[in-house]
């Protein structure tokens, strides 16, 4: 007679059971793409053991020193970002170096945004990302946990 194994039940979180933590990441000397993948995982909550795909169980992430990010190779001059106003001939293009000088937070935000899912949960996760160019941030009251990569 064949022995049957007990059926294991998958535990699914409800949105009331989710605890959102605050994490602090220092971007100084970090490579942009590698840092963005780790930030995206924490924002979606995939670093938690009880991650549930249909529930917003992500965390808050505070990134400091965004102006000291690193790009490999010749990407500072060869990587091009595009923006369009919606009017004919309204396309603008910027190199990574120009974008970094104009708005250093935007470089990390765009990299993380493009790694998140293009759904409602992805848009909610992006709102939990706080990026600052310097080493100061106004979220010390939340006591963020420092993540080292």
From Swiss-Prot:
BP terms from Gene Ontology: negative regulation of translation; translation
CDD domains documented for this protein: Ribosomal_L13 (cd00392)
Cross-referenced PROSITE patterns: RIBOSOMAL_L13
Molecular function in Gene Ontology: mRNA binding; structural constituent of ribosome
Record-linked Pfam families: Ribosomal_L13 (PF00572)
Keyword tags: Ribonucleoprotein, Ribosomal protein
CC terms in the record's Gene Ontology section: cytosolic large ribosomal subunit
Annotated family: Belongs to the universal ribosomal protein uL13 family.
Entry function: This protein is one of the early assembly proteins of the 50S ribosomal subunit, although it is not seen to bind rRNA by itself. It is important during the early stages of 50S assembly.
Binding partners and assembly: Part of the 50S ribosomal subunit.
NCBIfam families: rplM_bact (TIGR01066)
Record protein name field: Large ribosomal subunit protein uL13
Gene of this entry: rplM
């Amino acid at each position: 007679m064949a022995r049957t194994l007990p059926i294991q039940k998958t535990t699914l979180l409800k949105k009331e059971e989710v605890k959102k933590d605050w994490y602090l990441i220092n971007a100084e000397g970090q490579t942009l793409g590698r840092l963005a993948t780790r930030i995206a995982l924490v924002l979606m909550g995939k670093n938690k053991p009880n991650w549930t795909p249909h529930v917003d169980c992500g965390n808050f992430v505070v990134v400091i020193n965004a102006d000291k990010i690193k790009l490999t190779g010749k990407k500072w001059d060869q990587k091009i970002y595009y923006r369009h106003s919606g009017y004919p001939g309204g396309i603008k293009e910027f190199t990574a170096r120009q974008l970094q000088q104009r708005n250093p937070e935007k470089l990390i935000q765009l990299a993380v945004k493009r790694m998140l899912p293009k759904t409602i949960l992805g848009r909610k996760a992006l709102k939990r990302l706080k990026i600052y160019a310097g080493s100061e941030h106004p979220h010390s009251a939340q006591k963020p946990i420092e993540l080292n990569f």
